[in-house]
């Protein structure tokens, strides 16, 4: 494998190279160009430094996807602090648990989260910052209060004449193994594990995306960020890779209902679509299945010769439903509905199914849609090794193991769980059961660990459901 470059240097280079290109937009909102992002990062760096945030300190972020969230995250990484992205769907208690367990010094919150949390239950926090405008919800130090009140003044003092590309010089991680972020698999105490993601894993995932999509996506192409950036799938493939590439990323700041997603696809026309099965299934079942249930259409689909033309027409309509400009749709994060997958394969739709885990930030397996085998989740991704722990991997399911730079450092403050997941040879035990054919295609057959996966990609532990049911009995 090639020498691993600095990931923060890639962020820096993209900002400098694409200074006057469109970077981030809240759908139906204002556009931030790369130089606007750089200015916001610079101001947050001043606030961090002036308030006493040190390299390696933890900074948590909890809110819906937005340009302001993205800037705060980039500022955290490029300052040398450790980001702790938290799913905004988590309950207040879950957010409190993660903030406390991660030793977060600062917490960025969105509008809804700001009204739900109880700061008295996070006693070690020094401040809570409102994501939309970076105002202070709470300050427990005079340094932070002063830094926010005098932020514009300090920015003007540091850059008295102008703010340009030559001023961009970010913190560069000292080692590929340096901790970049901590991503929690669940919010519940006892089930929550903080995955320590190193910079090498961020680079390796971005390099994989460049290898398989680099010649399909160009500078200025549009991308829609639908999946939560607090989930590694959305973080790596709807945000970080595209930002490094110089794309224009649109954030759906509202609840992504099928109607809102369809409107966004039609307007933005994204070049690549990253999705969990739930989104694809909802759109197909709502927009496509009703049309093909018509008796005449069903008859045409069964007639040799004619059915091929019908499939082509349906495929065109389905493609248009997703904006009509994408190279492929990459589906992952949960099991795909077999009926929907069979239909998409039948009409030769450009889709593929990948496989990953938070612990691999996230990619483990992938295949381009032209090489994809239906029912599989692709082959070992670039930089990764995958094997099945079975005496007969082609026929007898065994646990899926993987190894490579994508694999986490371990679970934060949980050596026992780390030792149970990563063996002495460096193989990560996914907890998923699968088989592998002679060509290396992996087929998932179930779970070996006691964890379920919702169709939106969120981890669900049966014990959590049991605990909740006992509370409500």
PLM features per residue range, with description:
Residues 203-222, 229-316, 350:
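Conserved AMP-binding/adenylation subdomain of ANL enzymes
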Residues 387, 394-454:
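Conserved ATP-binding/catalytic segment of the ANL
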Residues 185, 471-473:
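Conserved small/polar residues in nucleotide/adenosyl-binding loops
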Residues 33-35, 171, 180-206:
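Conserved AMP-binding A3 loop
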Residues 10, 51, 78-157:
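Structural core segment of the AMP-binding/adenylate-forming
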Residues 271-274, 284-372:
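Gly/Ser/Thr-rich phosphate-binding loop
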Residues 20, 148-184, 191, 216-222:
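Conserved pre-ATP/AMP-binding loop-to-beta segment of ANL
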